[in-house]
Amino acid sequence: GTLTRKGRLFNPSVSPDGTMLAAVEYPVTGGSAIVILNPATGKVLRRRQMPDSLQAVEPRFMGNALIFNAISEGGSAIYRINAGLDGEPECLLGPVKVSIRNLNPVNDKVYFSSDRDGTQELYSINTESRKVFQHTSLPYGGDEFCFIGQDVIFSMLTKDGRLLHKAPALEMSGKEVDFNDIHQYRVADKLTMQERAFAALKCI
């Protein structure tokens, strides 16, 4: 049934112990907020309004904190705030004028996908050292990376269409990168990649 009766809530995330539900609220008046709800009743327990210059997107629980990505005039970034939603959000990465999405906290890292090098690839940031690693470099990129046990499932464009692939997580240990070093011709190269992919699809 319906858990909440009003509001515009998106991208829900459940805490590891199942006692809290986080979501992003986009009020009709504008702006954005992160809200913590009771997952059984839908009652709002806490609410944190974001600055007008920051649009929160995906909140994810990580220990006693919330990790969330946000968009501002400077680009995309990853922030951390305690689950009590008090204190100031701490910027872990960015802002950078690339996409950052599909956050997935695992132990002391946050995995995410980004088009930093021209195609969507899997990255991670160590929340303590702030080191960033690139874990994939696929011909046409990949997306919707999902960790299941010791494997990673993801969607990848091939000549046979957009297919799901599985790979051992250990094979994606990654290389450290400077996330601010953006592909100079990112947009043009991405369009070229897409054109090649569509051309390959037409040839089969």
How would you describe each model-predicted region?
Residues 38-42, 82-86, 126-130, 169-170:
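Short loop/turn segments that connect beta-strands within beta-propeller blades
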Residues 6-25, 48-69, 90-113, 134-153:
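Conserved beta-propeller blade repeats
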Residues 114, 162-163, 168-204:
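Outer-membrane beta-barrel initiation region
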Residues 30, 84-85, 104:
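Beta-strand-dominated lipid-handling architectures at cellular/organellar boundaries
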Residues 29-35, 74-80, 118-123, 160-167:
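Structural motif
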Residues 133-179:
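Extended, hydrophobic interaction surfaces within ordered domains
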Residues 26-28, 39, 71-72, 83, ...:
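Short polar/acidic secondary-structure junctions
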